[in-house]
Amino acid sequence: MFDRKLTLDKVDPDLWAAIQKEDERQEQHIELIASENYASPAVMQAQGTQLTNKYAEGYPGKRYYGGCEYVDIVEQLAIDRLKELFGAEAANVQPNSGSQANQGVYMAVLKPGDTVLGMSLAEGGHLTHGASVNASGKLYNFLSYGLDENEVLNYAQVEALAREHKPKLIVAGASAYALHIDFERMARIARENGALFMVDIAHYAGLVAGGQYPNPVPHADFVTSTTHKSLRGPRGGVIMMKAQHEKAVNSAIFPGIQGGPLEHVIAAKAVAFKEALSPEFKDYASQVVKNAKVLAETLVKRGLRIVSGRTESHVMLVDLRAKGITGKEAEAVLGKAHITVNKNAIPNDPEKPFVTSGIRLGTPAMTTRGFKEAEAELTGNLIADVLENPHDEANIAAVRAKVNELTSRLPVYSAK
């Protein structure tokens, strides 16, 4: 039998030490990676339960193993809460990631070689929307749309491509696009050209749930998402769909691309969906958008350009060329100042993908720890201070001290 007193710190001190260092890093640094957030203690607790011991191939009420009566309750809670949160007709909570959620939809409705429209990775899309290095781009005939001359999603291009190529599926959604996407218009283009319509809201899901970003569920045949990022849940994926597609999607996930579901993670998803249904989460989503607006405006005042001119969401792409610094260099030097960002290509970027001319910033994590407009403005100024003098160690140290004061005042997890 196991002794509950033999906790991780006693069983594996080396691993525990690394985890403690990561905890310190998360507490001390301002986290601005748009795809990252902090999960609640309840979400993390769910992932550490005995549910990790249970195999449960199949779906609630239709399992291939015995002893699933309680994991059925867990998974059904997650399904019902997800449907309530977004107004979906049907939902699958088993995908282990957003990428697998997308793959599940593709497997459900496409055959190898079918034509699909997706947003170009170089202009803000995602790997799984047809990038040549990804399985989606290898298995299917993806055609890419992008941005117009104002760096706004080019709906006219989508319409022209759809008319010319008559795709089986049109995919909307992005990993680095700051503005609202007109899902109703995209759905109309799909219908007029005989295509199914899928939306990947991995980045925007928390804002959609909080009423701060358009909800694609009424317009799309399929909506996929991750459950971390702006939803603040565990790392995982989900698929929402019209009822007529439920059987095909469920079969594509299991047995199509996955085996036994991770019920401990599904439990954590259920917790996150309950949290997202609360009035407090709507306040959180609203603050995320307010903070992003202030952060973007502050950076513009300090001489930096925001791709698309502004943000209407949680995320923004910052063009660094005016400062004479690459995204790779900016990521490194801001990291020294305890500000965590990721390098990111800008549209028509002249630099290589591992270098880039931009950085991507997001406000979900900073907002979770309690940052409001004043802290967002200060953060923007601290970023600009570093980028204006990236090789001045004294300047970096001064910014780091201000960051440490700010993060110590607003911890992620209170000590109480």
From Swiss-Prot:
Main subcellular location: cytoplasm
Residue numbers binding (6S)-5,6,7,8-tetrahydrofolate: 121, 125-127
Site residues, Plays an important role in substrate specificity: 228
Keyword set, alphabetical order: Amino-acid biosynthesis, Cytoplasm, One-carbon metabolism, Pyridoxal phosphate, Transferase
UniProt pathway annotation: One-carbon metabolism; tetrahydrofolate interconversion; Amino-acid biosynthesis; glycine biosynthesis; glycine from L-serine: step 1/1
Keyword Cell cycle: no
Gene Ontology BP, a term: tetrahydrofolate interconversion
Localisation: Cytoplasm
Enzymatic reactions: (6R)-5,10-methylene-5,6,7,8-tetrahydrofolate + glycine + H2O = (6S)-5,6,7,8-tetrahydrofolate + L-serine
EC supergroup of this enzyme: transferase
A GO term from the CC aspect: cytosol
Pfam families linked: SHMT
Cofactor: pyridoxal 5'-phosphate
Listed EC numbers: 2.1.2.1
Disulfide topology: none
N6-(pyridoxal phosphate)lysine: modified positions: 229
Top-level division of the source organism's lineage: Bacteria
GO molecular function, one term: glycine hydroxymethyltransferase activity
NCBIfam families assigned to the protein according to its UniProt record, in alphabetical order: PRK00011.1
Oligomer status and interactors: Homodimer.
HAMAP family (alphabetical): SHMT
Role this protein plays: Catalyzes the reversible interconversion of serine and glycine with tetrahydrofolate (THF) serving as the one-carbon carrier. This reaction serves as the major source of one-carbon groups required for the biosynthesis of purines, thymidylate, methionine, and other important biomolecules. Also exhibits THF-independent aldolase activity toward beta-hydroxyamino acids, producing glycine and aldehydes, via a retro-aldol mechanism.
Similarity comment: Belongs to the SHMT family.
Protein name (record): Serine hydroxymethyltransferase
Lineage: Bacteria, Pseudomonadati, Pseudomonadota, Betaproteobacteria, Burkholderiales
